[in-house]
């Protein structure tokens, strides 16, 4: 039984989140999704797991790219209900997906395994024990399986106090303030007036955790829209710092 409750299942929060995600000009649509898809291998006939799958948007894209079967896990019941509805609308996906109400921290309890690819978007900075999670992911992957994930960049997760931005007389962002970077651990935050916790790890810690869990890092990305000038006015803050860190790593056997 899962005793943990998702913030997305609280009154009105899911509706607010849905409105945010419906915006075609968002960090998810302009940065996260294109970068994640660019890191994927050929999915034809593959079995995938998406940790923290939300409403199943990535699962649908994986199926459209030829995945044989996709599994999604999430802590939020409302997210999974929406994912079920959206995936069922596409008749060709019938029998090719499964959804589990399961927090990422309890991945070991998932009855499925031998995944060719495991992905996760915007989720790992919520995990307290990252080494344990990586060990479980390693066990769930097939030989030479691939892990691809995005999380808030450590430059962002390190923040503890004060204003995040240095601004000029016109209130324009001119520099991002970096503080408490070396101080790893829990951060208390607030979004849509809902308190929640994230966990800060330095980039070095993330990389070393992956190496110690027997992963070979194949690619890292810190997208900042350098090649997409049409979005520079909408996302001016990206000229100062990358909001997300992406890592693609391959399972290495003992």
From Swiss-Prot:
GO MF annotation, one: methyltransferase activity
Name under which the protein is recorded: Uncharacterized protein HI_0912
């Amino acid at each position: 039984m899962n005793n943990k409750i998702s913030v997305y299942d609280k009154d009105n929060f899911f509706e607010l989140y849905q409105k945010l995600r419906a915006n075609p000009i968002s960090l998810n649509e302009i940065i996260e999704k294109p970068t994640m898809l660019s890191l994927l291998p050929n999915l034809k006939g593959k079995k995938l797991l998406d940790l923290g799958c939300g409403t199943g948007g990535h699962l649908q894209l994986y199926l459209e790219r030829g995945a044989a079967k996709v599994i999604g896990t999430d802590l939020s019941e409302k997210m999974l209900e929406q994912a079920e509805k959206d995936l069922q609308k596409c008749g060709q996906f019938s029998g090719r997906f499964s959804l589990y109400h399961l927090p990422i921290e309890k991945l070991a309890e998932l009855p499925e395994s031998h995944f060719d690819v495991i992905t996760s978007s915007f989720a790992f900075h919520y995990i307290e024990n990252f080494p344990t999670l990586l060990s479980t992911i390693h066990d769930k992957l097939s030989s030479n399986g691939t892990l691809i994930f995005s999380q808030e960049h450590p430059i962002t997760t390190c923040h503890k106090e004060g204003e995040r931005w240095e601004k000029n007389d016109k209130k324009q962002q001119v520099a991002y303030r970096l503080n408490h970077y070396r101080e790893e651990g829990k951060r208390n935050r607030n979004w849509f007036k809902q308190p929640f916790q994230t966990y800060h790890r330095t980039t070095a810690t993330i990389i070393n955790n992956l190496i110690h869990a027997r992963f070979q890092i194949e690619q890292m990305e810190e997208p900042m829209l350098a090649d997409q000038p049409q979005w520079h006015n909408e996302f001016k803050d990206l000229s100062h710092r990358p909001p997300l860190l992406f890592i693609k790593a391959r399972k290495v056997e003992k």
